[in-house]
């Protein structure tokens, strides 16, 4: 088992104790992700499917729970072992949440919801925010790349229409990002996000 694939450990430390902080009787938690604004007034949503396929399609295992218990206890956190054991026993290790989102590649005005997540089992109300860290990381990096390249494409196209051939736009921003990012996963996510807007790339992991 690789620690990086253990979804239980794919969170912030403070999230681990939050199950103790919800009001008594809580049965559901609904969270959403939005771009609150910045340099651009529109965001290109991208990255969620890659996260789901990589981290959520496989169930957690007893080994995942044991390893998480050992690590988080040593880290000084009150691990919700009973909650994760319940997920393993009741749901065969699959996480009882539903995630909804706009289609990948959609251009969305800022201050609008991009994705939502909520628990589907009242016993697992705490799970929604446990997954927040991983979801934000999974979405914001490729979404930022896709958004940046979308706006860069507009600038290039404006000048092509004045001085060149607009039909060549798809190959006017070439991606060599594989050599400049922190990991192969980052290269793949950023490279795929670039391909939402352009066709030129040397980032092989982006087309896998």
Roles of regions detected by a PLM:
Residues 48-56, 67-72, 83-88, 131, ...:
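Generic structural signal of hydrophobic/aromatic residues within well-ordered alpha-helices
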Residues 29-80:
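Low-complexity, highly charged intrinsically disordered N-terminal segments
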Residues 2-39, 87-96, 105-109, 114-208:
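Buried, small/hydrophobic-residue-enriched core segments of structured protein domains
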Residues 63-65, 76, 80-82, 118, ...:
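Generic detector of short, locally flexible boundary/turn motifs and exposed helical patches
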Residues 65, 69-104:
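Active-site-flanking structural segment that lines cofactor/substrate pockets
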């Amino acid at each position: 088992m690789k620690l990086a694939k253990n979804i239980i450990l794919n969170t912030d430390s403070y999230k681990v104790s939050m199950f103790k902080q919800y009001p008594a009787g809580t049965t559901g938690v609904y969270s959403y992700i939005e771009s609150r604004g910045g340099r651009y007034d529109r965001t290109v949503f991208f990255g969620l499917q890659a996260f789901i396929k990589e981290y959520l399609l496989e169930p957690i295992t007893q080994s995942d729970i044991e390893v998480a218990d050992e690590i988080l206890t040593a880290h000084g956190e009150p691990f919700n072992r009973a909650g994760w054991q319940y997920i393993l026993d009741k749901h065969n290790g699959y996480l009882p949440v539903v995630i909804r989102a706009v289609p990948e590649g959609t251009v969305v005005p800022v201050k609008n919801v991009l994705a939502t997540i909520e628990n589907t089992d009242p016993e697992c109300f705490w799970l929604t925010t446990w997954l927040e860290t991983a979801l934000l990381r999974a979405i914001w990096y490729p979404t930022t790349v896709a958004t940046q390249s979308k706006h860069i494409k507009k600038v290039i196209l404006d000048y092509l229409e004045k001085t060149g051939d607009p039909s060549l736009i798809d190959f006017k921003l070439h991606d060599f990002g594989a050599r400049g990012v922190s990991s192969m996963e980052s290269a793949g996510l950023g490279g795929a996000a670039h391909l939402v807007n352009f066709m030129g790339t040397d980032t092989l992991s982006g087309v896998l």
